[in-house]
Amino acid sequence: MDNKMDLLSAYQRILSLSEQMLNLAKNEKWDELVDMEITYLKAVEVISHSSISSTTSLSLQQKMTNILQIILDNENEIKKLLQKRLDELSKLIKQASQQQLLNDSYGQFPVEPYHNTLMNSTEQK
């Protein structure tokens, strides 16, 4: 990036993408989050080849520092939300595995006929 304002604009674009990704994570829109991550990574790659020169004004450096801090905070929050989702999925997988093991071991129990038989036997007493 040749222009310092272009660099600032690139940082602001990454911030915008970061905020959108955080909103997607908060709303549990995981597929959209994954799709947006590709765009986000491409934007990060653009600035990774750039550097802030020593001639960059202090106020511009401060703006970029503030933007980076917000981006990092957003990333940490996204990671927490992703970990929470991973834990939920792990729990569901464990439950499904246990259910499959029970079904394999004992066969699948028909819920309704058993329930009706149980209800009929208690009504007759």
Curated annotation (Swiss-Prot):
Compartment(s) where it occurs, according to its Swiss-Prot or TrEMBL record: Cytoplasm, Cytosol
Annotated spans, Required for homodimerization: 1-50
Entry keywords, A to Z: Bacterial flagellum biogenesis, Chaperone, Cytoplasm, Repressor, Transcription, Transcription regulation
CC per GO annotation: cytosol
A Pfam family matched in the record: FliT
Keyword Transcription regulation: yes
Keyword Cytoplasm annotated: yes
One example of a Gene Ontology biological process annotation: negative regulation of bacterial-type flagellum assembly
Source domain of life: Bacteria
Residue numbers spanned by region FliD binding: 60-98
Subunit field text: Homodimer. Interacts with FliD and FlhC.
Functional summary from the UniProt entry: Dual-function protein that regulates the transcription of class 2 flagellar operons and that also acts as an export chaperone for the filament-capping protein FliD. As a transcriptional regulator, acts as an anti-FlhDC factor; it directly binds FlhC, thus inhibiting the binding of the FlhC/FlhD complex to class 2 promoters, resulting in decreased expression of class 2 flagellar operons. As a chaperone, effects FliD transition to the membrane by preventing its premature polymerization, and by directing it to the export apparatus.
HAMAP family recorded: FliT
Family designation: Belongs to the FliT family.
Protein name in UniProt: Flagellar protein FliT
Organism expressing this protein natively: Photorhabdus laumondii subsp. laumondii (strain DSM 15139 / CIP 105565 / TT01) (Photorhabdus luminescens subsp. laumondii)
